[in-house]
Design a protein with these regions (language model features):
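Beta-rich nucleic-acid/ligand-interaction surfaces
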Residues: 49-56, 153, 223-232
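Long, continuous compositionally biased terminal/linker segments
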Residues: 232-254
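Short, well-ordered beta-strand micro-motif
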Residues: 64-66, 77, 232-236
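Acyl-donor binding region in acyl/amide transferases
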Residues: 81-214, 220-228, 240
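Intrinsically disordered, serine/threonine/proline
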Residues: 1-3
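Short low-complexity, flexible loop/linker segments enriched in glycine and/or proline
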Residues: 54, 159-163, 231-235
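Short amphipathic alpha-helix that is part of the acyltransferase structural core
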Residues: 5-73, 80
Length: 254
């Protein structure tokens, strides 16, 4: 973990506490939860140690979300980049050419490996997760929150309506691909598939991004290793509607 990072104090709200991971035990707890979400649930071969871990973990700061009994119900990791030229060291840069973000002035905060337990109240966990993210954005002075938003499995037909909607309403050509296998979106389509069906196919975290003015790449990457499809996702802080920004900061302030 990035021991040099500035850490916000824990955030308590709605029966949950969000805090920064401290030490190896906290990190292993997050990696074990991630194994359930990104290995077991994805039908991938289990890791011998039961942990989902990679070379980016030591570079990141990890956020844990616990209930009042101290049970881990959610986690994610973040990595901060001060300048566009540093983005090549991000997780997303394995799959996407991030040169298209060089117009931004300010820092870049990458969010990844977001997951919650299946029995957690998603809305409450998401709310406090975003509250802690708001604190981190303010702490680092980030101009954009970005990452890869994943769809389970690698069959694009399962997400046809979602991809139609993303292509028609939310896609940007500024991020090109570095991946070998991609699925392009129809960005010229004026009448996407039924919106309710499309939104039902979009993961909750990505729906939240979009509701705040976020945008996605004009293609999805097929990630065979993770058994997912994912899209680059960007949320420029200045583009968040004032009412949403105010609500987020109200949560962040506890």
């Amino acid at each position: 973990m990035n021991s040099d990072a500035r850490h916000p104090v824990p955030l308590a709200r709605g029966g949950y506490v969000a805090r920064m991971a401290v030490g190896r035990e906290d990190l292993r707890a997050a990696q074990a939860m991630r194994h359930v979400s990104f290995v077991d649930a994805a039908g991938r071969e289990a890791m011998a140690d039961g942990l989902d871990q990679d070379a980016y973990d030591p570079l990141c700061d990890h956020v844990l979300i616990e209930d009042t009994n101290g049970r881990l119900v959610g986690c994610y990791r973040v990595q901060f980049f001060a300048a566009p030229e540093d983005l090549s060291n991000s997780y997303s840069a394995q799959y996407y050419n991030l040169d298209g973000l060089s117009y931004l002035r300010g820092g870049f905060l990458e969010l990844g490996r977001f997951c919650v337990t299946s029995d957690a109240a998603d809305s409450d966990v998401l709310r406090i997760a975003w509250g802690m993210l708001a604190r981190l954005v303010d702490l680092y002075g980030a101009a954009i929150l970005f990452g890869c938003s994943s769809f389970s499995g690698t069959d694009p037909s399962c997400y046809a309506a979602a991809f139609d909607l993303l292509g028609a309403k939310h896609a940007s050509p500024r991020i090109s691909t570095l991946a070998d296998e991609t699925i392009g979106f129809q960005t010229s389509q004026k009448n996407p598939a039924d919106r309710a069906v499309a939104l039902g196919q979009i993961p909750p975290l990505l729906r939240t991004y979009l509701s705040m003015g976020g945008w996605v790449s004009d293609h999805a990457v097929v990630d065979r290793e993770m058994n997912t499809l994912h899209v680059f996702t960007g949320l420029e802080i200045a583009a968040i509607p004032p009412a949403r920004a105010k609500a987020l900061r109200a949560i962040a302030n506890g």
